[in-house]
Amino acid sequence: YERKNKDEQLLNKETCLILNQLLTAPFNKAFNTYTSATMSAYPTKTTFAVKTGSTSYDSLCAGFNPNYTILSWVGYDDNREMTMATDSKIPKVIFQTMANELQKDESWYKPTEKLQQIPINPISGEYQENGVVYFSLEPKPLHPDV
């Protein structure tokens, strides 16, 4: 018996790019409000998407770009609580170091013609000429007065 693969694309390029772009926000200082964007103190030389997480027992940082996937995790094998204030920073430093060492040239996903890039204020969600780029599948005026 040989299984026959049924090739079926489950995700479309536009949705993937929107999700990838959203995951770059932890590096963007524009998202610093009452608390800092989780990776704003650990910038990388090139674009990466990232997700961080922590509990009392461990901390992780996972990220990717078209060329690399990096995951760093810290915790104790015996499941002890991490009590040092710096413990949750370690995976971020590891991620930053590895990303900067591995990726020398910019490499990021290219938007398709179906996506519109709209600059917005990340706090208000309103149009802002020098705002953070937001991708939309729905046609929207580039400026609310248009």
Could you say what each language-model-derived stretch is?
Residues 1-145:
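A penicillin-recognizing enzyme superfamily signal
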